[in-house]
Design a protein with these regions (language model features):
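Acyl-donor-binding surface of acyltransferase catalytic domains
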Residues: 72-141, 279
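Conserved hydrophobic beta-strand within the GNAT/NAT acetyltransferase core sheet
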Residues: 98-101, 216, 250-254
Length: 283
């Protein structure tokens, strides 16, 4: 079977807009081109081609592509064709790397990606906490929300406090925080909420949150304060903040091999919701 491909500026995209808008919303404001792969009238997948710092897995300016499988109900042969053709398109566009995230249950997809030159980059869980009971928050820590002009102070502490992570994607992101254009920083800052966390006058943690979505993007604790309950209190602060924002649940991601963190999250009421794998192809 041969899939049909339409580009982002093709008039036919309007006919599939409803199926793809959740994926295109974050890229279209940046002018990132994309291609839609169709089987008949069904959207099988999407490919976006742009440059860092879209994902921060490589230095700013690095050309990249991101694949999204939209319809996992398609026959395996169709999904394999999409992934193979998406990689061909990416090579034609001269990207340095391509990557895709998919549910770990789809082992046949992992096998196919391995066969066309991809390697596993990350293996992680998404965990959920249902905010249906009152949240108690200890009062040992103080949380101060950051202003935009304080980003220069935030990134160095983020690197320091999140060092030693078992998350390969996070490690790459921390390496590539330099030279991000101010316009993109403005857009990013408008979507997130950052906090410095204090014990007395000392900064002992950082938080990167999306409160309206109930999403904990990053939580970092100073190495000298790990294992002392600081991280747990920071998480409880997040849960209370999200609950006050009207969120019904809180979500976070964690490396599947980080059993210590998973245990802490489960103790606080989180449960594993989804198991995801990230595969990457490099030129």
């Amino acid at each position: 079977m041969v899939l049909r491909v339409i580009a982002h500026d093709d008039a036919e995209v309007a006919s599939v807009r409803e199926s793809i808008s959740a994926y295109t919303a974050q890229y279209e404001p940046l002018g990132v081109p994309y291609w839609v792969f169709l089987s008949g009238k069904d959207v099988v997948g999407l490919v976006f081609v742009g440059r860092e710092p879209l994902q921060l897995l490589a230095p700013v300016g690095t050309p990249l592509s991101r694949f999204y499988v939209i319809d996992y109900e398609q026959p395996l042969s169709v999904l394999e064709e999409f992934l193979s053709e998406a990689l061909k398109l990416s090579k034609t566009e001269k990207v340095d790397y391509a990557y895709v995230i998919f549910p770990a249950e789809h082992t046949s997809i992992a096998n196919h990606l391995g066969g066309i030159g991809f390697n596993e980059l990350a293996n992680r869980y998404e965990m959920t906490h249902h905010l249906d009971t009152p949240i108690d928050q200890p009062g040992n820590l103080r949380f101060r929300r950051l202003a935009r002009e304080e980003l220069d102070q935030f990134f160095p502490l983020m690197k320091k406090f999140m060092s030693g992570s078992s998350d390969n994607v996070l490690d790459l992101v921390l390496q590539n925080l330099e030279n991000i254009p101010e316009q993109l920083l403005d857009m990013w800052f408008a979507q997130i909420t950052l906090f410095f966390v204090y014990l007395g006058d000392e900064i002992v943690g950082v938080l990167d949150l999306r409160p309206q979505a109930g999403w904990i993007s990053n939580i970092g604790v100073a190495p000298s304060h790990r294992g002392k309950g600081v991280g747990s209190e920071m998480l409880q602060f997040c849960l209370k903040l999200f609950q006050d924002e009207g969120c019904k649940e809180a979500k976070l991601g964690v490396s599947a091999v980080n059993t210590r963190a998973i245990h802490v999250y489960e103790k606080l009421g989180f449960s594993i919701d989804e198991h995801l794998q990230t595969f990457i192809w490099r030129k």
